[in-house]
Design a protein with these regions (language model features):
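Short hydrophobic alpha-helical segments enriched in small aliphatic residues
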Residues: 5-7, 13
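Core AdoMet radical
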Residues: 83-103, 107, 111-130, 145-158, ...
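N-terminal [4Fe-4S]-dependent radical SAM core
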Residues: 33-76, 81-117
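Acidic (Asp/Glu)-rich catalytic clusters
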Residues: 107-111, 136-144, 166-174, 206-210
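Conserved C-terminal portion of the radical SAM core fold
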Residues: 199-250
């Protein structure tokens, strides 16, 4: 199906769709200046929405996950190690404002006029009381130069009241919700201790997109036990979902 879905990595796209594609083979109608590419780059997605450079600033707001605290399991996902992708300044003893200050200080050296998106990245960033969540989001939005939020979360941790908040916020700020799907196969989700089903993933994506919110999905390629055909089948499944962006990990 023809969807305006943006992806993060050419290498991952080539691997994922080596023998098939979930999009039309002719992308010229979507991207006339990029005829050699069969996907939209994430950078282009941002360029089309901002008239200036924007940079994500990662934040560790001190959240946990339901498969870490006993609500759905213990220990978290089998592969989880947030330290592998968290910047040095992301420490929970620092406030949201302090983490933004350090991130902005780093990037503003090269691009003084840069604007920013607060990226709530570590663990499940919608897994707390609604008032506590909104307070942290609003703290980030109040920081000078921050023009929106990107919130990483699980598909089983998006209450309707929070979706309503994001829907209202998206009318005046950039808002994207990124869901960790990781796999479209329930047997794999059990194996890696995710604690949710693919049906829950599809439901969360459709509910979020239906409210007009930019909706992203994360997928891991090469999880234990998945065959090549099963990995390629992820493309067929995801192409039927109303996602805005897709990030592929391996």
């Amino acid at each position: 199906s023809r969807q305006n879905t943006y992806v993060f990595s050419e290498k991952h796209v080539r691997l994922f769709w080596k023998t098939r594609t979930c999009f039309s083979k002719d992308f010229s109608y979507l991207c006339p200046m990029e005829k050699t590419k069969r996907y939209y780059e994430y950078g282009k997605f941002l360029q089309e929405r901002f008239d200036h450079k924007v940079q994500k600033i990662s934040i560790n707001a001190g959240f946990t996950c339901p498969n870490r605290d006993g609500a759905k399991g213990w220990g978290g996902c089998t592969y989880c190690n947030n330290q592998t992708f968290s910047p040095e300044y992301c420490h929970t003893e620092k406030s949201v404002t302090e983490q933004l200050e350090e991130g902005v200080r780093f990037f503003s050296r090269k691009y003084p006029d840069m604007r920013y998106l607060a990226y709530f990245q570590a663990y499940t960033n919608t897994y707390d009381r609604l008032d506590s969540l909104i307070r942290k989001y609003e703290e980030a939005l109040a920081y000078p130069g921050v023009e929106g939020l990107i919130v990483g979360t699980r598909p089983d941790c998006m209450p309707e009241g929070l979706l309503d908040y994001f829907a209202e916020l998206s009318q005046r700020k950039f808002v994207m919700i990124e869901y960790g799907l990781e796999s479209t196969l329930d047997k794999t989700l059990v194996r890696i201790n995710r604690g949710h089903t693919h049906e829950e993933s599809e439901s969360a994506i459709r509910r979020t997109a239906a409210k007009g919110i930019y909706t992203g999905a994360h997928l891991i390629l090469g999880l234990p036990g998945e065959s090549r055909d099963e990995i390629l089948h992820h493309a067929d499944v995801l192409s039927r979902l109303p996602i805005t962006t897709l990030k592929l990990h391996q």
